[in-house]
C-alpha cells in the first residue's frame, strides 16, 4: 500500500532524518580524534565511521510487484537514492529507473497493474510533495501532479482497479484537498469531489468514496458517509477529543460490506473492530490491554483481516486467519529478531519480509509461501557486518505520578556488564548518557536497530529513548495525559527518566545531554531553559522555541486540525491559552540557558519555521550566551540529504565529546561536502572553525 502522507488524526511534527533510509555517504573523515571517557578500556572498541551509520543504505524500501514479476527498491545512483527494479527471479539484473540528482527518493509503491512504480518527492524539504510514476518497461517518467505549492495525498489504491488511483490535491484551496481520479496511463486528472472543509477521506476497493472526516468544535472528529460523491450533511458518528488519536478507519473488504477500524471508544487501548456497513453494528476482532492495535494485515484480494500486531515493549505479530498462522509460525521459528511483512503479491504466494536483529542493520528476505522458503535479498548496510554493535533493552520506567513509560536503553559495548542479563542493561559502571527525545510528540519510540543509538553508544555514551506522556501506542489515557503539558509534565517525565538512569547506575549525574528533533528539539530547549542545571548540554534539531509563532505558521493544509492542536498544545485565542503558551515557550526563558547548546535547522521547514531557531539564537546572542547555529538551505523538517545529516552529526559528536567526554571522529572535509551554513558560534563547537577552512 502507498504511504499515508497525512494521517487522519492530528498531524505529528515528526522528525525523521535520523532514519537509515534517509542517509547518504559523505567522504569519510581522516584519522579520528578521540577523547577518552571515564571507564574501563574506553578505546578497546573500534570507532565506527559515522558514514557507515548515516550514509546511503546499500538498498532499502523493497517492494514486490502485485503480479509477482518484479522486485523494486531504492539504492544509490551517483550518490543519491533512486528507484531500481529487477526481475523477481534475477535480482542481480537490476537497473535504475530514475535519475534524481538532488533530493533522495525515500520510498515507492507499485501501481495495481504492476506496470508503474509510483513515488513522491519534494524540493529542498518544502514538503510540497508531487506524485511521479515511472514505467517499468520503458523507463518513461511522468509527473502526475506538476503543481506549485501543492501537496499530494494518495487517498485510494486498489487491486480491483488496475488503471487509476484516487489522489487529493490542494492546488485550488491550500487548506483542503480536493479528490481526483488519476488515470495512470494518460496522467489525466478528473475531479471527483470538491473539498470545502474535510480533513480526510476513505474509499472502498472499487475506489468509490465512502467516508469523510473533519474535526468538530470539541476538538474530536465527525465522520460522514459519502454517496455518489456527495457528503451527507449529518455525521454517522462522532469521536471525542479523548479518542481522536486512537480511533480511525482502516479500510473496506472487497465486497464493501465491512469496514475495519481501530477504535478506543469505550476502552483505553485501541481495539481492531469490524463494522457492518449496512447496519452500523461493530464487532471486536482483537484487542490488547497493554497497547493500541494500530493496523492490521489484510488479504490482498478479499480485504478481510488476517492478522495484526501489538507493539508494547516489542512488536508481536498475531494471526487471526488459520491459513496464515503456519506462515507466521514458520517465520517466528526461522527468524532471529523482529520481522515485518512489507509487501505481498496479489496471489499472496510471495512476501517480502524485513528482519530486524537490533545488533545488525535490517535485512530483507523473499518468502515463498508454497515452498516455505526464506531467501535473503539484501542487507541494508553490509558495511556494518561484523561491527561492534550493541543490544537495546526495553524498560518500564515509572513517572513521579505513577504512569509507566516504555523506554529503550543502549549502553556502550565496553561497558556491558557480564554480571547482569542483557535485558537489564546495567553497565559495569555509570557512563555519560544522551537522553534522545522523539518528535511528534504524538508518536513513539520502538525496539529495534537504531542508527543514532548505535552511533552514540560507539562514542562511549549510554542512550535512553523515553515514551513520555503524550506518546501514542499505549492507550488513550497515556496520550491524553500529555494535553496542555508541553514543558511541564511531559518535561517532568524526561527528568524522571534521567533520575531512573542515575539511580540505577547507568548515567553519571553531571554528564547527561539532551538531544532531539522537532518536539524533541523543543524538549531540548525546554530542558536547558526551564531546568538549566539538569543537563550538561543540548542538541536541538528543528525544534520550536516560541509556541505562539509555531501555531501561527502551521502549513495551510493542517487547517482542518487546528482545533485539535489548540486543545492539545494551547489556544492562542484565549487568555488562559495565551498565558500557558507564554510560560511554555523556551524563547521567553532564553536568559536562563547556561549550558552549551547546538542548534540545527532546515531553511525550508514548513512545520517548524526557520524563525523558530532564529528567534532563540538572536535572544541568546543579545545576552552573550554561547550557542552554535547551523542552517541547511536545501533542507526542511530534518536533514534528508545525507551529506547534510552526516555533516551535522559530525559537529554533534565533537560537541558532545567536549561536553560529555566521549569519543569523536574528526570532521576533516565533511562540512565541505554539505550545504551547512554556520550562522553563529563556530568557536563554541570543537573543530568547527577549522573544518570551515578546509578547501
PLM regions: where:
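Active-site-proximal cap/loop segments of hydrolase catalytic domains
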Residues: 466-695
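Non-catalytic accessory segments flanking enzyme active sites
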Residues: 60-63, 95, 106, 129, ...
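Structural motif
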Residues: 80-84, 126-132, 174-180, 218-224, ...
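Multi-bladed beta-propeller domains
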Residues: 29-59, 86-106, 111, 134-152, ...
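Conserved beta-propeller blade repeats
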Residues: 56-74, 101-121, 131, 148-170, ...
